[in-house]
C-alpha cells in the first residue's frame, strides 16, 4: 500500500489498541513511535521528526484536545488525526485537529485518512 517511511506518532493509553495500530501502520509502510499518555507523546513530538500524529481523545491526565493544543503551539503544521470512542466531540477540540474519526470506523478508514493528511498540498 503506502510505500513511504513517514514517521507517525500514535498516542493512546490503551496498550492493546496502541499495539494493533502500530502493527497496522508498520504493515502499511510507516515508521511508528508510540506513547501511552499525553506528556510522553509531547516529549516525543518535540524531539523527533514526526510527520503526523494519531491521537486518542480519552486519556488520563491530559485528554487528546489538550495534547493537540500543545502540539499546535510546538509544531503547528504537523497533521493530527484525533481518534475517539465518542461521537460528537466539542468544536473547541475538533478545531485543533486536521481530522477526527471514531475508533469504530476501522483500519481501512484510518489508513485512508492518514494517507490524505500526508498528501502534499497542491499549490495550483
Stretch-by-stretch model annotation:
Residues 46-48, 71-77, 95:
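Conserved phosphotransfer cores of two-component systems
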Residues 15-33:
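Two-component/phosphorelay signaling modules centered on CheY-like receiver
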Residues 48-54:
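Active-site beta3 strand of CheY-like receiver
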Residues 37-40, 63-67:
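Acidic catalytic/metal-coordinating carboxylates
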